[in-house]
């Protein structure tokens, strides 16, 4: 599955670095490189928004590596549990970014 998230932050430069650091860590744990793409940001009303595309192989590797943690995450649907896990993972690494799943296929 390919997941596309809309990310939002009020501290784009700081959170972008923290996001890249956290995603780099999770890629290393999953033995994946180039598992996601960040689109160009758009700023509105003090917030900066951008899309993050998570490639299928990265998503599947995360599900395999962290299956127990994902199962315990909030949500009734698998994609909700995955998103909650990812938000918790980022937050634990100091990244205060907000993620909203906008498409998965």
Give the ranges of each region predicted by the language model.
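Short secondary-structure junctions
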Residues: 27-36, 90-95
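A general secondary-structure signal for short beta-strands and their flanking turns/coil
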Residues: 1-4, 45-49, 92-94
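Extended Gly/Ser/Thr-rich low-complexity repeat segments
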Residues: 21-25, 60-84, 95
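Short acidic DE-rich linear segments
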Residues: 97-105
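Short, extreme N-terminal segment that most often corresponds to the first beta-strand
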Residues: 1-23, 103
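Short, intrinsically disordered low-complexity segments
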Residues: 31-76
